Amino acid sequence: VIATSFTGCFGRKKSGEAFSMPIMDEPTSLDPQIADSNSEKLVAANCYEGLVRIMADGTIGKGVATDWNISDDGLTYTFKLRNNSHWAMFSGHKAVLGENYEDTFDITVKAEDFKFGIERTLSEQTGSADAPLFSAVKSISTPDDFTIVFNLSYADDNFLYALTNPGAMPCDEEFFNLTNGK
């Protein structure tokens, strides 16, 4: 909870100003789906934006999701995403994505990226510490680029809070595969 609180506290960044925060140990991975230590979770919370976030008062607020609906029985969660969220891309990506990656690689964060991220979290092969948080998830669908629907096998009052954890962060499948998951 502390890590996600820091992400919104510094809205008046001046040009050339850096934000630094001491962490207990050096993260061994920047992959949010396998973030395990407090340091890794702290880094993930400050590098990725989820569907929702925990606000200063402890309530759930908007992240990439602009709106969401929960069915009366608590088994279906539907999120609408904003269409102007983008992956940060740097010139170093040319080695992996090609010289003209800006023209060939879609940097828009889409519903499918959240679906793939949570599916990775749930995969035994990933071994994510966050997997138990999503045990209620029966299926995930993306009816369009900016809508994601979670169908749960049982009502989970903590599901929105689970979505604030690193295991729920987006992961672009094309980029993941091109980099062999690194």
Positions of the model-derived regions?
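Short, low-complexity disordered leader/linker segments with a strong preference
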Residues: 1-19, 29-32, 59, 99-103, ...
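Short, intrinsically disordered, charge-balanced linker/junction segments flanking boundaries
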Residues: 9, 178-182
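Short, solvent-exposed loop/turn elements at domain surfaces
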Residues: 15, 27-34, 59-61, 87-89, ...
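Extracytoplasmic
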Residues: 16-18, 46, 63-65, 72-76, ...
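N-terminal lobe/hinge region of extracytoplasmic solute-binding protein
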Residues: 22-72
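Solvent-exposed coil/turn segments that connect beta secondary-structure elements
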Residues: 24-27, 35, 56-57, 73-74, ...
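Aromatic- and charge-enriched surface segment that lines or borders ligand/interaction sites
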Residues: 66-126, 149
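Surface-exposed binding/hinge segments that line
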Residues: 113-115, 120, 126-179
